[in-house]
UniProtKB/Swiss-Prot annotation:
It is a multi-pass membrane protein. Disulfide bonds: none annotated. Keywords: Membrane, NAD, NADP, Plastoquinone, Quinone, Thylakoid, Translocase, Transmembrane, Transmembrane helix, Transport. This is NAD(P)H-quinone oxidoreductase subunit 2. Its main location: membrane. One of its GO terms (cellular component) is plasma membrane-derived thylakoid membrane. GO terms for biological process: ATP synthesis coupled electron transport; photosynthesis, light reaction.
Length: 506
């Protein structure tokens, strides 16, 4: 009988998607041992099977979620399923745009794939972790793998510098999280997030407030929110571009998933305090991210500051604290997956053919490569929130949810900074489509001849076409995607309890 109870409480089926990722890690390491030629052939196949199986198992869990597993340390509820699906899909697209870049850099493909899958495993586990210990293990799995990926180009001093900066700042963030967790454990005598939330309701104190600040600092680091953003531009510029593409979506999504869970459970009784702090972070992120992006000359640094601003937009939905607000945040992260990875696909293709990352070198690109020009233009317009792109509908839902919850300052700042972002996005587009051939950059004038064949498309082009199609069809896809996001929020028990309490108070 005790064994049966123990088995029921484990509910190991909750981590079947992560088990497929773990098998993929083992498989890629084994083929890497067999030699580079074998790894180049089989590592991508293993990754596709692993991630595809994980996505299928997540889809099957949607109608039968597991709300408590491993003695309450992990939840596979619908919200966790939605975030884990975004992360798994972002990894799949990131790997599609990585193979050619990795081969050209002379790096071992099997080893690279194993580290990316390890980061994915940590990110997915973080989305469902409901215990301080499981959160820390997931967080460090994601972080350590991310440090390795940032410094993967060993011969490039910029990559090593990026990895060192990321390691130092990430280690500080981990230490701050542990310090805050020790306070929470001392106040409650438990490591379970929900239990801690119940125990500290009647124990408001300076220590509790301090633990909230420490935990929020860790969250802000993971989502690259101001003022915890300093690592982002340097790490984005120095890291391999496919790694930047993955970190910009996968790591940020995991950070937001963790933020929603811990703020809605552990700190639900400190609703006003954390919303005030999040409001400040959102305003600073939207303002600084989009204003500083105006002055950038590197495409990757521009996208880095853009990602800081995008984090601020997502925070509008979280601060609103309503079902529509949280659903809008999930929807925008799904939209961000396609428009951001689509932009990075174009940046990678351009850098592979020219070796350049400077924005001015894109001048006149439409003359030599109309497809990259079209794809990058659509993705940048979507990031700016122009209709009828997917990003427009994502921002509209966020702004409506914020306005309905009386978050007027956040919405106004969001609208103003969106206009600012449109300016620097359109500046890049204008540069690519200059009218006179003599205005093209020297890099573009020596651009290699391109032959785009539909048959036998390499993985990078498949990723590019997919992202462009989803981004451009925003008007058609926004409603079904919002319904899925709304379902993820409405069918998650802990969120419904919090929303019910909030509605009663209002």
């Amino acid at each position: 009988m005790p064994n049966e109870i123990f088995t029921i409480n484990l509910n190991a089926q909750a981590i079947i998607p992560e088990a497929f990722i773990l098998l993929g890690i083992v498989g890629t390491l084994l083929v890497d041992l067999a030699g580079e030629k074998t790894a180049s052939r089989w590592a991508p196949v293993i990754c596709y099977i692993s991630l595809g199986s994980s996505l299928i198992s997540l889809a099957l869990q949607w109608s039968n979620p597991v709300n408590s597993a491993f003695l309450g340390s992990f939840n596979s509820d619908n919200l966790a399923i939605a975030f884990r699906s975004i992360i798994a899909l972002s990894t799949l697209i990131s790997l599609l745009i990585s193979w050619r870049y990795t081969e050209q850099s002379g790096s071992p493909i099997g080893e690279f794939a194993a580290i990316v899958l390890s980061a994915t495993l940590g990110a997915m586990l973080l989305c469902g972790s409901t215990d301080l210990v499981s959160v820390f293990i997931s967080l460090e799995t994601l972080s350590v793998a991310s440090y390795c990926l940032s410094g993967y180009l060993k011969r490039d001093p910029r990559s090593s510098e990026a990895a060192l900066k990321y390691l130092l700042v990430g280690s500080a963030a981990a230490a701050v999280y542990l310090y805050g967790s020790s306070f929470l454990y001392g106040l409650s005598g438990s490591t379970n997030l929900s239990t801690i939330g119940v125990e500290i309701i009647n124990k408001p104190s300076f220590i509790t407030s301090l633990s909230l600040v420490f935990v929020l600092s860790t969250v802000a680091f993971k989502i690259a929110a101001v003022p915890f953003h300093q690592w982002t531009p340097d790490v984005y510029e120095g890291s391999p571009t496919p790694v930047v593409a993955f970190l910009s979506v996968g790591s940020k999504t995991a950070g937001f998933a963790f933020a929603i869970r811990i703020l809605s459970t552990t700190f639900s009784s400190f609703d006003e305090q954390w919303k005030l702090l999040f409001t400040i972070l959102a305003i600073l992120s939207m303002a600084l991210g989009n204003i500083v992006a105006l002055a950038q000359t590197s495409m990757k640094r521009m996208l880095a500051y853009s990602s800081i601003g995008q984090a601020g937009f997502v925070m509008i939905g979280i601060v609103s604290g309503t079902q529509d607000g949280l659903s809008s945040a999930v929807l925008y992260l799904a939209a961000y997956l396609f428009m951001n990875l689509g932009a990075f696909s174009c940046v990678i293709l351009f850098s592979l053919r020219t070796g350049s990352d400077r924005i001015t070198d894109y001048s006149g690109l439409y003359q030599k490569d109309p497809l990259i020009t079209l794809g990058l233009s659509l993705c940048l317009l979507s990031l700016g929130g122009l209709p009828p792109m997917l990003g427009f509908f994502g921002k509209i839902y966020l702004f409506f949810a914020g306005w309905a919850n009386h978050q007027y300052l956040l919405v106004v700042v969001g609208l103003i900074t969106s206009v600012i972002s449109i300016y620097y996005y359109i500046s890049v587009i204008k540069m690519m489509v200059v009218k006179e051939p003599q205005e093209a950059s020297e890099i573009v004038k020596s651009y290699p001849e391109i032959n785009w064949n539909i048959i036998g498309l390499p993985p990078l082009r498949i990723a590019l076409y997919t992202c462009i199609a989803v981004t451009a069809l925003g008007g058609i896809l926004s409603n079904p995607l919002f319904k899925l996001a709304n379902s993820a929020v409405s069918e998650t028990p802990f969120l419904q309890n919090i929303l019910a309490i909030t509605n009663n108070v209002l």
